[in-house]
Amino acid sequence: MAAATALCDAAAPRMASKKRIALISTGGTIEKTYDELQGVLDNRTSVLDVMLASLQLQGIEIVRIPLMNKDSLQMTPQDHDLIARTAGSMAEAHDGVVIVHGTDRLARSGERVCELLGSPRVPIVLTGAMRPYVMRNTDALQNLTEALLAVQVMPAGVYVAMHNQVLQFPGIVKDKDRGTFVRAGG
């Protein structure tokens, strides 16, 4: 009887521990909301918690790091350094890092992460949106979902995940004509 119990215990599925994913928010189009008084889209309040609440996220624990809430066109070299350093420190304590970022300067931050960190020990995935989450035809939720999946399955490195593709830095640029990211020269 003890042998049968031991076999059953050995065959029982083990509860896998949840992957801890750091989610660094920096603002950008993905997080813009409509300011009715001013009649403009602006980075005032993050919508990431609303987006995350709409997803089935079994198997991962999201640790939110609200770093800044800027349009990426307003980012300085110091902002890109701060993003890279924060990603590096989060990579030491988590199974992966997702950086939500404005698309106009996303490639610059991705390159800076590569320069500062070299080869990170976990995947670091940048994502954003061409259209805000609050708009009907947004790509925000798709891109966030893709980044959360990519950070779990890609090997260690720095990536952008958007529009049904995952591209590894360095050498990634925004193609404004196609409205997505591509490999430089591609």
Residue ranges and their predicted role:
Residues 1-5:
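Compositionally biased low-complexity segments, especially N-terminal hydrophobic helices
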Residues 7-10, 14-186:
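Active-site histidine-anchored catalytic micro-motif
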